[in-house]
Regions:
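Intrinsically disordered, low-complexity segments enriched in serine/proline and basic residues
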Residues: 380-386, 466
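Surface-exposed extracellular loop regions of Gram-negative outer-membrane beta-barrel proteins
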Residues: 271-282
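An alpha-helical repeat/solenoid feature that recognizes helix-turn-helix modules
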Residues: 1-12, 32-76, 87-128, 132, ...
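Edge strands and adjacent loops of beta-rich recognition modules
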Residues: 223-236
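N-terminal signal-anchor module of multipass membrane proteins
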Residues: 14-24, 31-32
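Extended, basic/acidic-rich, low-complexity regulatory helices/tails in eukaryotic proteins
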Residues: 98, 638-639
């Protein structure tokens, strides 16, 4: 039974307040949403290994001028791992994740070292159970099968195990760290065997492999010996001042353990990395997958609340977001100015998902969700008023839009970090990111210009002529973007996302998330009548569970996040509105039984590394409930 308009309004008000209560000020910063990323067995194991290598090299925290005890941190991590081992002997990436070969091999390796040096209750039994799990899945070959030709994660995992003496160095693939000495503009051309964000691992792990098992080819050995110092200079230059590469404990740990193992324990990159790891450990002895997604969850919250963001919060939120836009070329990915990262911390990198999120949030903070003008003259007045009333936001969004257009791939889609860097998944165009960019273009420009101003059948050579102004450039880019979405839609009408999955679905896919996000672009760009949008909506409606909720795919147990996304977008398809309200009812039940804020491990933090974020279910639910309030009206009963 669908909820009444009054029930929806009441539920929205309650959920909205829960979300607003999470907007806080810490350490004197402007109030914003911080969220909380899942703690991680993988992060904990790699951080422990990095510190173990430092201890093995004869260094203490005092040598690093750090107020910590390395052995206590290692012991605390070991106890946490023992306590959170799954019944099958393995570990998953989060405390809610099923076991996988990668995380289990990392945990097994570090606990093997710890149990041989310290007395940790249960460690020996944990090591034995983990070994049985690893042997059953196939060990090294199972890791290689999981990642295929992408060496971004398989080589670091095997390096970690080699440092524990459990894998022969000959099993660890060499990484061409000498390529890091090339100017950054050539990285795309040389097709690195790792994705763009893994350059630090390419350098450090490539060097430790070269140290322990150099190439048989004398010319390659000579070249790599010559490249050691210069590539280390690159590594030092791209490391953020707080030491945390991408604010990620795993990447920072892989770099640190590798450099220490090859004798560089006193190198500045190591010293910064160790400090970052010591400062990011949690009270229970574990490490999170990343420090935070503060910028990302703040923009999600603003875009969910829209004009319900309190007036008292708007100036500080706007100032905080504007202050995070990159004004200089980024030293890590060589990204041009104009983008936003997922965090306000130094390890962030501008990307094509957080940038449109920030653009949309700034627009909503200024616009207070002004209704879309119906006639062309009103749209032009609306646009002029927006420019006059908020020049800093317009300037920021124009800069971001130029940045996004320059990032667009030749296939019409958008990658995450770097245009045309390589062929590996996390550097290729993806539907969910492309859809997010299209939504930012729509709210920035198509509030004044119909998409029909540049028809879909416009010849390519005519489209290029529109580049005389940003608006036409944006429209041309958007049409190419919709072309990419049409090409990547699957036969069943769904789209697959890059950054989200579902561990219970086939191949860890999440067509519910991907299709919902793409349909939001069709909605915001007023293309719901297209064949692609209708097929996508039909797919979403077809996989709803009997209880009204949605999982990641057909027949998968529902989650708050997936139900909220699917229900919200289906509210705009009249033929599926009753099903959408069924999903809203499911969310309302979760609100009142206290499980609405229970997160699910749906996020991918690079290369099949799962995470969950505490605020995701609440933010997505608020967005869906708010839209259902608008659709149901003040008195109307949804049918």
């Amino acid at each position: 039974m669908s909820p009444s308009a009054a029930e929806i309004r009441s539920a929205y008000d309650k959920a909205k307040q829960l979300l607003l209560d999470q907007c806080v000020s810490i350490n004197g910063q402007s109030a914003h949403w911080y969220g909380e990323l899942s703690t991680s067995a993988l992060s904990t194991a790699t951080a422990m290994m990095a510190l173990l290598q430092v201890v093995k090299a004869g260094r203490s925290a005092r040598d690093f001028e750090i107020n910590a005890d390395f052995e206590q941190l290692i012991g605390g991590g070991a106890r946490w791992l023992v306590e959170h081992q799954n019944q099958d002997g393995g570990w998953g990436d989060t405390t809610k994740s099923m076991s996988n070969i990668s995380t289990t091999m990392l945990c097994h390796a570090v606990l093997s070292m710890v149990s041989g040096q310290w007395s940790v209750a249960g460690a020996e039994d944990a090591v034995s159970c983990a070994k049985n799990y690893i042997d059953k899945l196939g060990g090294v070959e199972a890791v290689r099968r999981r990642y295929g030709k992408d060496k971004t994660f398989s080589v670091p995992i095997l390096t970690h195990c080699a440092l524990a003496g459990l894998v022969d160095w000959r099993e660890v693939s060499s990484l061409p760290f000498e390529l890091a000495c090339l100017p950054a503009r050539f990285y795309a051309a040389v097709k690195l065997p790792v994705v763009s964000y893994a350059l630090p691992a390419l350098i450090a792990i490539g060097q430790v492999k070269h140290h322990f098992a150099p190439s048989w080819n004398p010319l390659v050995r000579w070249l790599r010996n010559r490249a050691i110092n210069k590539s280390l200079q690159v590594l030092e230059r791209i490391q953020p001042p707080n030491g945390g590469f991408l604010e990620a404990a795993p990447l920072t740990s892989f770099v640190t353990m590798s450099l220490v193992a090859k004798g560089l324990v006193d190198h500045v990159v190591v010293r910064r990395g160790v400090r970052f790891l010591c400062e990011s450990v949690r009270p229970d002895g574990s490490w999170p997958i990343d420090t935070n997604l503060a910028t990302w969850v703040t923009t999600l919250a603003i875009n969910a609340l829209k004009d319900d963001v309190p007036e008292s919060l708007r100036p500080d939120l706007m100032k905080w977001l504007l202050g995070q836009q990159y004004r200089d070329v980024h030293p890590f990915t060589n990204a041009a100015p104009g983008g936003w990262a997922w965090t306000d911390l130094p390890g962030g990198v501008p990307d094509a998902d957080d940038t449109p999120g920030a653009m949309l949030a700034l627009y909503h903070l200024v616009q207070w969700d002004v209704p879309y003008p119906e006639d062309e003259e009103a749209r032009e007045r609306h646009c002029r008023k927006f420019h006059q009333n908020s020049p800093p936001v317009c300037a920021a969004n124009d800069g971001a839009l130029k940045w996004l257009i320059d990032l667009q791939n030749v296939d019409g889609g958008w990658p995450t970090f770097c245009r045309g860097w390589g062929t590996l998944p996390f550097d290729r165009s993806s539907p969910d990111i492309t859809a997010h960019v299209l939504r930012a273009i729509a709210i920035r420009w198509w509030d004044c210009f119909y998409p029909e101003s540049l028809p879909l059948n416009t010849p390519p050579h005519h489209r290029r002529a529109f580049k005389k102004s940003l608006v036409y450039t944006a429209c041309a880019a958007a049409i190419d973007g919709f072309g990419f979405l049409a090409k990547t839609q699957r036969r069943d009408g769904s789209w697959l996302p890059l950054w989200f999955g579902n561990q219970h679905a086939q191949d860890d896919e999440n067509p519910t998330y991907g299709t919902s996000r793409v349909l939001m672009a069709y909605r915001d760009c007023r293309r719901l009548e297209t064949n692609e949008a209708q097929r996508g909506a039909s797919f979403l409606a077809s996989i709803q569970n009997p209880d009204g909720g949605w999982g990641g795919a057909a027949g998968i147990a529902p989650s708050v996040e997936e139900t909220a996304l699917a229900a919200e977008v289906l509210l705009d398809f009249e033929q599926y509105r009753s099903q959408a309200f069924g999903g809203i009812g499911w969310l309302i039940n979760r609100l009142y039984d206290g499980s609405l804020t229970e997160p699910s491990p749906l996020g991918f933090y690079f290369a099949k590394l799962w995470y969950f974020e505490r605020l995701y279910p609440l933010v997505f639910a608020v967005s869906a409930l708010r839209r259902s309030v608008e659709v149901s009206g003040p008195e109307e009963m949804p049918s």
